[in-house]
Amino acid sequence: MSSFVADKIVMDGLTYDDVLLIPAYSDVLPKTVTLKTKFSRNIELNIPFVTAAMDTVTEAAMAIAIAREGGIGVIHKNMSIEEQAHEVAVVKRAENGMIYDPVTIRKGRTVKDALAMMHDYHIGGIPVVDDDNRLVGIVTNRDLRFEHRLDKKIDEVMTSENLVVTHQQTDLAAAAQILQENKIEKLPVVDANNRIVGLITYKDITKAKDKPMACKDEKGRLRVAAGVGVTVDTLDRMKALVEAGADAIVIDTAHGHSKYVVEKLVEAKRAFPNVDIVVGNVATGEAAKLLVEHGADAVKVGIGPGSICTTRVVAGVGVPQLSAIYSVFDALKGTGVPLIADGGLRYSGDVVKALAAGGSSVMIGSLVAGTEESPGETIIFNGRKFKTYRGMGSMEAMEQKNGSKDRYFQGDTLEAKKLVPEGIAGRVPYKGTVQEVIYQLIGGLRSGMGYCGANDIVSLHNAKFTRITNAGVLESHPHDITITSEAPNYSRPE
């Protein structure tokens, strides 16, 4: 006799609070584990953290901060093509071994022009060139600090005499010595005709020493990814992002197991064969296989687990996150394609569980939405500091001019009142800097790997779980006590 359970229930769905990792024999110390992993087929990370392509999470400041820690940020697409490409460019110029395409300013421009460029590109100095791109001077923020005449030509304030320059063959160690000996902070790199071909800065050399684990490309620039949707201008957006320096493109939709997503993936790989294309979101091995067969370089996993997502209650669809992660992990064995576990993470222990279930990295939104570097608005409520945080399926995010309604396949809906949101908007407590948050997350991850005897993330995939009851969840949290001192890595579940 058939039954609903026998005919319709095809799997058990488990998520983070349903299980705990079983401690195992270990000869691994937390401080000795390696956190290196893959974001996509060709991009390595030094820590397994990716910041989400959300308009209250990742713009240039967040992407720079997470890349300096060793992860990567995905610039959201709720902006014009030009604005998103600019955010990518800002990240790529934030740090360099040598800046190969430095921002320059033409002789004859004004102080106002120079100040605007410094502000737009977050830089402190600009080489001045003539119409043939030959170096004629350099202007820095120190030259302009007390300059009140904004219409004054930069020729009158720039440094032009006894310019210290170097040539393309100079390595960074030699460049550092030149900077030190001449007590300067910027070293233009010129060719035999005195045309500028690069710029080496003291700040970049110092940053490289201070952040040795930063995630960088072969030119010494911070890595960054950028999100796109499935729209008529997707390829135009991709082209602008790739030209701006994006290391990877993330095709970001609510349902990656879709004909339209697959078609856009094929178009993207054909147009940009040398760029890694990440695709999501999915929740089954079948979906992941389909995407990889059509060229995906990484698969993003998660249908509705996020704190600001309502897909599971609005649409009745989803797979509890740990089961979804393992389903995709099992399907992708032997392909060399990593998976990104996206959503549902509240504590560092959840990160350990997500990676142990098969994730190569985790995508974080709420965990960093309250940081200084997030683009969310800072607000004061009842004397406490908060930052706004909203889902890309929220009404507020979808109804913007360049909003995210296409992510939920509602791109042709013109009236806001006709939109069907799959997310909410809210606020999260202010948390300080990304560096502080990531430090605690890494500490918890290292500890978990030590308990499991895993010296790297691939080894962590061999860890075993135990299913727990609601009583086990209660026992896992602090109990029978009034907390009088808050820990930086724990708050009671609401």
Question: PLM features: residue spans?
Answer:
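Glycine-rich phosphate-binding active-site loops on the catalytic face of alpha/beta enzymes
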Residues: 68-83, 246-258, 297-315, 345-379
